[in-house]
């Protein structure tokens, strides 16, 4: 099906029956439109095949990862030489209001953001290079590249 979406990848996740798809790179505001269309198509295709699709953070309780939307983004300053400092400044700014932001992540986040299974707790904020347990994970290659443009 050609829906004009920039689907750049798919992969299986940890929870049984859990799959992930990636959209992008796409600029703003087009990314918001593409995400809404992709989710709508996901539900309609599942309906056509008499299966269910859910965005519930942890639809199957158990000792495994939950599911949640995560995004990769950058600003012009983050992509320039010395951009790591802009990344840290952005992380620090987000951390100042983390409790406000997390209130808008949807119902059930406490089931997914437990501090286990490659997540930070929903009530704790952190960031770090290659830290899969942080709220914000900064890619290792970005940190070690001579220039963010090399990443």
Residue ranges, per PLM feature:
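Active-site acidic/histidine clusters and adjacent loop/turn architecture
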Residues: 1-36
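Histidine-centered active-site/metal-ligand motif
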Residues: 11-13, 68-72, 150
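Short, ordered beta-strand-loop transition motifs
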Residues: 12-15, 138-142
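Glycine-rich anion/phosphate-binding loop at the beta-strand->alpha-helix junction
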Residues: 30, 35-141
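Single conserved hydrophobic/aromatic residue that forms the stacking wall/gate
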Residues: 143-151
């Amino acid at each position: 099906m050609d829906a004009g979406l920039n689907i750049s990848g798919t992969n299986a996740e940890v929870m049984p029956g859990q799959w992930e798809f990636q959209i992008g790179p796409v600029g703003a505001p087009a990314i918001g439109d593409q995400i809404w269309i992709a989710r709508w198509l996901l539900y309609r295709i599942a309906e056509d095949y008499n299966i269910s699709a859910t965005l519930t953070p942890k639809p199957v309780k158990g000792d495994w990862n939950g599911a949640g939307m995560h995004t990769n983004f950058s600003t012009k300053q983050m992509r320039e030489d010395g951009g790591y400092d802009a990344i840290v400044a952005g992380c620090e700014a987000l951390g100042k209001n983390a409790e406000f932001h997390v209130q808008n992540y949807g119902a059930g986040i406490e089931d997914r953001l437990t501090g286990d299974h490659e997540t930070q707790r929903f009530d704790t904020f952190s960031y770090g290079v290659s830290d899969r347990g942080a709220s914000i994970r900064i890619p290792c290659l970005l940190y070690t590249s001579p220039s963010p443009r090399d990443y």
